[in-house]
């Protein structure tokens, strides 16, 4: 698990990245399923600030502050309704009151579930949400396991899964097994984050933990990034990397 704070036009956005254990290849003790559930739970506790068992390098305990902007990214190896993970594993994030489900879809995912058949025919998750193209005979079939999940209050302008249909010229980039790139599909979102504090709100209480700010500025809460502004961000997460595009005035800058 990585919490990477990124400053976007004066507002801190916490990129929360992880790759929980696949809930498969298990013995009778189901160790991998349990690890997957708990590794997902860590972020659920962290964004709800109920993670008293966690502490940072300065010894401060807990997770993010209530007004923190964040986006959870990665391959979480858990589908809401299908696959091998424990029931409710990914719902710890998808149903959290702190999190927005961007619900990205693709035409290719729905089409492939129909064409490939097998386990896909008995799945309960809408195949338009699928992000992974896995073995269908006998299982697990295609699954939704890759996510871009921002904090509540974030404006989701666009979201999707890059999974072209077979008649699309870009299908060569995803293809069929053995895949030319990955069995995971790129999940992307264009997000506009809320500002952390409005200019009329008081400064954070000195009783709350603070982090040093440049000379002449009020201190900020260590995990909040309490600045005004409405930063826009486009995010894509796929196998092996993350692309973050931020809009600053009339220019675009990219960070990878």
Q: What residue ranges belong to the model's regions?
A:
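Beta-strand-turn-beta hairpins that frame and shape the catalytic cleft
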Residues: 1-24
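Metal-dependent phosphoester-hydrolase catalytic domains
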Residues: 3-7, 34-40, 45-71, 76-197
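Short, glycine/serine-rich, charged loops/turns that create anion-binding
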Residues: 20-22, 77, 228
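A cross-kingdom C-terminal cell-surface attachment/processing module
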Residues: 228-251
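C-terminal low-complexity, Ser/Thr- and acidic/Pro-rich disordered "stalk" regions positioned immediately N-terminal
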Residues: 195-224
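Acidic/histidine-rich helix-loop elements
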Residues: 25-35
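Juxtamembrane extracytosolic/periplasmic "stalk" immediately C-terminal to the first targeting helix
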Residues: 254-256
């Amino acid at each position: 698990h990585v919490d990477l704070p990124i400053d976007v036009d004066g507002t801190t956005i916490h990129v929360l990245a992880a790759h929980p254990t696949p809930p498969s290849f298990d013995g009778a003790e189901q160790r991998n399923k349990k690890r997957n559930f708990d590794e997902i739970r860590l972020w659920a506790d962290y964004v709800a600030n109920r993670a008293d068992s966690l502490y940072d390098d300065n010894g401060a305990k807990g997770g993010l502050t209530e007004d923190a902007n964040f986006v959870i990214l990665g391959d979480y190896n858990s589908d809401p309704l299908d696959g091998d993970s424990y029931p409710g594993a990914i719902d710890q994030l998808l149903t959290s009151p702190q999190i927005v489900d961007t619900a990205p879809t693709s035409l290719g995912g729905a089409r492939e579930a129909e064409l490939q058949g097998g386990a896909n025919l008995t799945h309960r998750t809408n195949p338009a949400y699928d992000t992974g193209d896995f073995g269908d005979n006998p299982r697990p079939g295609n699954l939704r396991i890759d996510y871009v999940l921002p904090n509540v209050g974030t404006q989701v302008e666009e979201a999707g899964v890059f999974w072209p249909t077979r008649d699309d010229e870009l299908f060569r980039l995803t293809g069929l097994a053995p895949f030319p790139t990955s069995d995971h599909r790129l999940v992307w979102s264009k997000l506009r984050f809320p500002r952390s504090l409005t200019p009329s709100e008081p400064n954070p209480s000195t009783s709350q933990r603070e982090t040093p700010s440049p000379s002449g500025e009020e201190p900020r809460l260590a995990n909040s990034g309490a600045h005004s502004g409405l930063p826009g961000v486009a995010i894509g997460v796929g196998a092996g990397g993350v692309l973050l595009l931020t809009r600053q005035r009339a220019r675009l800058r990219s960070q990878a």
